């Protein structure tokens, strides 16, 4: 049975990296009988605005709702500015419509050969290995707001409910329990100032205590966590659990630790991946890179996002692990794009990973 994957390439570099992820998935299907894919391409972001006037056309959303998983490249660019219709609105809408409440962003080194590229000293960066679990459909990004209407006043509101925090805490706990021994959980908030953070801390505490007493829970204020991240990131190893706004900021800060935004994948899930078949949307942590010439963008974050899709949504864990192994082999061999000090093109890196994954699975 073929897996139905909706591909939303998006804008600029998103279109290039989506092609490379598909290249790797098609290579897998050549050697793995269980891995058969049916790809459907749709518009999102600026490309969709140009073609339809909407950042997320109805047909794209309808197709995504019927798919086994969604692969998304990247959206945005200066062409679409900050007008009333913006590419990023398509992202927010698809997350909300598909109820993708949990965003998972791993932060680790795909290969230790990349340690010298980190802005941190190698002795501080080495061993960094955590997953940011960010709430994705609530909080200040979706709260009530008022624009400045000439009166010089604008505001946004942060609101969380107990069930919203509980389900994300359960996601973090599930991920922690996939390891032996279980990973610690770091819950980040601003409970010394914000009412929403006090509810967050209380709910996380109760949920772990009542449902997962075997897990170690640590609370950390977000500003303190941001300092730890640049001073000694391994202190946060485990599962980092936090709200939409704080997660957006801390995961972007974390994404530079491995040396390039072009390395880190992400998954946005609508349910626990307890059967490895959770519905999810998979995209790189980086943006559309409109300033990069064609053929220069690093496709690894997109390819590793596809690996997460194989493991969490398509029940193809062996194939997902093979992709991760192939990425390490290719990086260690010195085949790299310019952001990693190499001279290879986007497609050359994709070709090398596709070849390596076939050899691993053959």
Curated annotation (Swiss-Prot):
- SUPFAM superfamilies on file: Isocitrate/Isopropylmalate dehydrogenase-like
Protein family membership: Belongs to the isocitrate and isopropylmalate dehydrogenases family.
What's the subunit arrangement here? Homodimer.
Cofactor dependence: Mg(2+); Mn(2+)
UniProt cross-references to PROSITE patterns, sorted A to Z = IDH_IMDH
User: Which PANTHER family does the annotation name?
Assistant: 3-ISOPROPYLMALATE DEHYDROGENASE
One cellular component (GO) term of this entry: cytosol
User: Which sites bind substrate?
Assistant: 95, 105, 134, 223
Q: Name one GO biological process term.
A: L-leucine biosynthetic process
User: What are the record keywords, sorted?
Assistant: Amino-acid biosynthesis, Branched-chain amino acid biosynthesis, Cytoplasm, Leucine biosynthesis, Magnesium, Manganese, Metal-binding, NAD, Oxidoreductase
* Predominant location: cytoplasm
**Which positions carry the signal peptide feature in this UniProt record?**
none
Q: Does the keyword Magnesium apply?
A: yes
Q: How is the cofactor bound?
A: Binds 1 Mg(2+) or Mn(2+) ion per subunit.
Q: Where does NAD(+) bind?
A: 77-88, 287-298
What is known about what this protein does? Catalyzes the oxidation of 3-carboxy-2-hydroxy-4-methylpentanoate (3-isopropylmalate) to 3-carboxy-4-methyl-2-oxopentanoate. The product decarboxylates to 4-methyl-2 oxopentanoate.
Class of the enzyme per the UniProt entry, highest EC level = oxidoreductase
EC no. given is 1.1.1.85
Which Pfam families is this protein grouped with?
Iso_dh
- Protein name as it appears in the record: 3-isopropylmalate dehydrogenase
What compartments host this protein?
Cytoplasm
Residues that bind Mg(2+): 223, 248, 252
Q: What Gene Ontology molecular-function terms does this entry list?
A: 3-isopropylmalate dehydrogenase activity; magnesium ion binding; NAD binding
Is the keyword Amino-acid biosynthesis assigned to this protein?
yes
Pathway in which the depicted protein is active: Amino-acid biosynthesis; L-leucine biosynthesis; L-leucine from 3-methyl-2-oxobutanoate: step 3/4
